[in-house]
Swiss-Prot record:
Catalytic activity: Endonucleolytic cleavage at a junction such as a reciprocal single-stranded crossover between two homologous DNA duplexes (Holliday junction)
Superkingdom in the source lineage: Bacteria
Known EC number: 3.1.21.10
Catalytic residue list: 7, 68, 141
InterPro entries referenced in this protein's UniProt entry, alphabetically: RNaseH-like_sf (IPR012337), RNaseH_sf (IPR036397), X-over_junc_endoDNase_Mg_BS (IPR020563), X-over_junc_endoDNase_RuvC (IPR002176)
Intracellular or extracellular location(s): Cytoplasm
Protein name (database record): Crossover junction endodeoxyribonuclease RuvC
HAMAP family from the UniProt entry: RuvC (MF_00034)
Taxonomy of the source species: Bacteria, Bacillati, Bacillota, Bacillota incertae sedis, Caldicellulosiruptorales
Function: The RuvA-RuvB-RuvC complex processes Holliday junction (HJ) DNA during genetic recombination and DNA repair. Endonuclease that resolves HJ intermediates. Cleaves cruciform DNA by making single-stranded nicks across the HJ at symmetrical positions within the homologous arms, yielding a 5'-phosphate and a 3'-hydroxyl group; requires a central core of homology in the junction. The consensus cleavage sequence is 5'-(A/T)TT(C/G)-3'. Cleavage occurs on the 3'-side of the TT dinucleotide at the point of strand exchange.
Cofactor note: Binds 2 Mg(2+) ion per subunit.
Entry binding sites for Mg(2+) 2: 68
Any one annotated GO CC term: Holliday junction resolvase complex
């Protein structure tokens, strides 16, 4: 199974492509970020996100997409903007006939570290360790995208797994 993990954002969207044959061993295919300039109109930023994601999907041919669920408590403007980016991401995946699975930050933390209240540093160290990377992927959004992809692989291989496709 090849999973495209995504940590959505308008300024920066992290992505990571991971492959697993048995649900416990991981092979990193690629990871990186899609950046948009704040000097562009929002519509142009969303278009850039769309075209870059289309290229990534075309190049790496993932089987499924795992995306981090939106969680904000205070800044509604940020939540709306990220919601718009998520909409573009979900539409792009649907247009490419990809199944999409969402995971909360709590689910990702629990899956990767075994502790639902793990902090960013703990998650990043586990991502580095589990993927056999020489350094922690930067920026944080990229490490988060890899963590979401691993979360899907680990969750889907669990006997407790319940399919929760978007």
């Amino acid at each position: 199974m090849r999973v495209l993990g995504i940590d959505p954002g308008i300024a920066l969207t992290g992505y990571g492509i991971i492959e697993s044959k048995n649900g416990s061993e991981f092979k990193v295919i690629d990871y990186g970020r899609i950046e948009t300039s704040s000097s562009l109109k929002k519509s142009m930023r969303l278009l850039h996100l769309y075209t870059e994601l289309c290229s990534i999907i075309s190049l790496y041919q993932p089987d499924v997409v795992a995306i981090e669920e939106l969680f904000f408590s205070k800044n509604s403007k940020t939540a709306i903007t990220i919601g718009e980016a998520r909409g573009v991401i979900i539409l792009t995946c649907i247009q490419n006939n990809l199944s999409i699975y969402e995971y909360t930050p709590l689910q990702v933390k629990q899956s990767i570290t075994g502790y639902g209240r793990a902090d960013k540093t703990q998650i990043q160290k586990m991502v580095k360790s589990l993927l056999g990377l020489s350094e922690i992927p930067k920026p944080d959004d990229v490490a988060d995208a890899l963590a979401v992809a691993m979360c899907h692989i680990l969750s889907s291989s669990s006997v407790l797994y319940q399919e929760d496709e978007v």
